[in-house]
Amino acid sequence: ADGCYLYSPHSTPSNLYLGEALAAMEGTETANVAASGMGAITPVLLQLCNAGDHIVSSRTIYGGTYAFLKNFTTRLGIETTFVDITKLDVVEAAITDKTKVLYCESVSNPLLEVADIKGLSTLAKKYNLKLVVDNTFSPLSISPAKLGADIVCHSLTKFINGSSDTVGGVVCGTQEFINDLRNVNDGASMLLGSTMDSLRAASILKNMRTLHIRMKQHSFNAAFLADKFQADGLKTVYPGLESHPSHQLFKKMMNKEYGFGGMLTIDVGSLEKANELMELMQHKNLGYLAVSLGFYKTLFSAPGSSTSSEIPEEEQVAMGLTDGLIRFSIGLDNNIERTYKMMKA
């Protein structure tokens, strides 16, 4: 009720309005916004796990999440097994009697592996686990909660805000779980203090109004460039290409009108070539050499030395993350054919 907002770190009207909008988008009962994506993800895992518990996680995830699970939660007695999330038999084999959480990204960063959310949900139910999905790469394109995920997280910094001027995160889930996170006595979101600033919340809510239009354009442009890059003989990874190993799976899960998303990768063979190409593109004003994504301009980076740099080199190699890999977040260019011609020139 109005008048009950006693203390801004607990709650504010702007934060609650944004949370409700995001819950409606993801099809969950409610949501809790946070100061960053990591400020959303870390309390979820700490709320679900105690000392002695175990997590099974995808091996290809955002570097910060990987570092949190690999290096930080171990201090608290929480162990994680990293697996190839695309192989359900491997995932199942990693589950122990101490496992509490299955963790993945719907489309992984940066290799764009696609998680079988329905299959993972079946496993989670079989072993009484919580399936937590980071949906940052595919808002609107994929709806994890409708496919069986228990909890859906986002970095709002990326596509949802869309203008690279704000940091934020969200946890979407049941009213009961969100209440637990917000509990003033033992709620991880409440006590760890990653409160979103109310002005940020109002700003993101404003930008959300164009998300449906933006995602369609990101997807259209990315699909066009992926086709062209592949035809040019570049090793191109994009879920919308039939050559992508999970193309059919993505097709089955997707909300068709929003396409296959705005993220693609190409492998140019070496870090030198990757840097050369990225500098050339920046020089031609075709985008920015930057590690964020979901911006209205195209962004590109070499993940091995940026967003996945927390992952040790030998593990990067094992998961197929090579030096020559360039990750693209394709922008909202009005004439993507012209952009492609300028890239080629």
Specify the residue positions occupied by each region the protein language model found:
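PLP-dependent enzyme catalytic core of the Aspartate aminotransferase-like
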Residues: 70, 271-272, 279, 298-345
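Conserved small-domain helix->loop->beta segment predominantly found in fold-type I
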Residues: 223-284, 288-296, 311-317
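Short, flexible turn/loop "capping" segments at secondary-structure junctions
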Residues: 162, 196, 255-258, 319-323
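Conserved N-terminal alpha-helix of the aminotransferase class I/II PLP-enzyme fold
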Residues: 1-39, 64-71
